[in-house]
A protein has these predicted regions:
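A generic structural signal for short, non-catalytic loop/turn and secondary-structure boundary residues
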Residues: 1-2, 50
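The identity of the second residue at the extreme N-terminus of proteins
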Residues: 2-3, 65
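A short beta-strand micro-motif
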Residues: 4-13
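Short, mixed-charge low-complexity intrinsically disordered segments
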Residues: 17, 30-79
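Conserved aromatic
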Residues: 22-26, 57-58
């Protein structure tokens, strides 16, 4: 079974910018904190989805459900 991929999505409602995949949620959460420059309050919206100050940290399955254009580990876009 492949390891789950996690993504950091900035500006989800206007111009979504999706990061490269992270191997675990902890790496993705740390990356989202670095975008803001400080640790902000985390709001768990649903399974595999956390909002941090207007940034979404979610799994590949959630990102595909929201129809964001995401990349795999080789840099190819998922269909």
């Amino acid at each position: 079974m492949a390891s789950p991929s996690w993504y950091v999505i900035e500006h989800p409602f206007t111009r979504p910018v999706v990061s490269n995949p992270y191997p675990s949620s902890s790496f993705a959460l740390d990356a989202a904190d670095k975008v803001h420059g400080e640790r902000l309050r985390r709001v768990r919206v649903a399974d595999n989805e956390v909002w941090i100050g207007g940034i979404i940290v979610c799994s590949r399955k959630k990102a595909m459900a929201y129809k964001f254009k995401i990349k795999d580990w080789e840099g190819r876009y998922y269909a």
